[in-house]
């Protein structure tokens, strides 16, 4: 059974797409599918998506006309079969224990969403895949009302407004 559907919208991402996909494939938790949504790329990204799909049975590719980021994410959602859904941008690199850690907390807390922080890099030379995820002391259980109040009060808005850095329960 597929636990997580990872949706990666791709548009003109040739220079960093392989690093993104490789970081997802390196996950310690292997109960996932990857949905690459090529949003009309003309830089060779579409071909990279197809190459990975040929080698990995867990990867599905959707090719569509350019419709923007939300359109690409929605196309991925239409075929997502996982119990949970995660969005990763094509220029993102994820920690090798990200899924394992997030799923553990979600199941222990019976939560619908897991929100984690993001680190921004101008350029990544080498990704530290050995660093331990420090989750023990930073888990907060918040109700929808608490999150809503933080959004409207401007508290850590960047943590809540992006689709990335979250694992959502799929109520499909």
What annotation goes with each model-predicted range?
Residues 1-172:
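Nucleotide-sugar donor-binding/catalytic module of glycosyltransferases
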């Amino acid at each position: 059974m597929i636990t997580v559907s990872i949706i990666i919208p791709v548009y003109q991402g040739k220079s960093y797409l392989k690093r993104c996909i490789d970081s997802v494939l390196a996950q310690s938790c292997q109960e996932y599918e990857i949905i690459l949504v090529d949003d009309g790329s003309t830089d060779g990204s579409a071909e990279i998506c197809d190459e990975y799909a040929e080698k990995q049975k867990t990867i599905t590719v959707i090719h569509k006309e350019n419709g923007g980021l939300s359109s690409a994410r929605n196309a991925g959602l239409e075929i997502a079969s996982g119990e949970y859904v995660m969005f990763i941008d094509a220029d993102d690199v994820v920690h090798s224990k990200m899924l394992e850690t997030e799923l553990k907390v979600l199941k222990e807390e019976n939560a619908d969403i897991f929100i984690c922080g993001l680190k921004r890099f101008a350029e990544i030379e080498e990704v530290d895949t050995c660093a331990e995820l420090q989750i023990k002391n930073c888990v907060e259980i918040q109700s929808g009302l608490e999150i809503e109040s933080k959004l409207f009060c401007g508290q850590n808005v960047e943590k809540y407004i992006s689709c990335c850095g979250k694992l959502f329960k799929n109520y499909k």
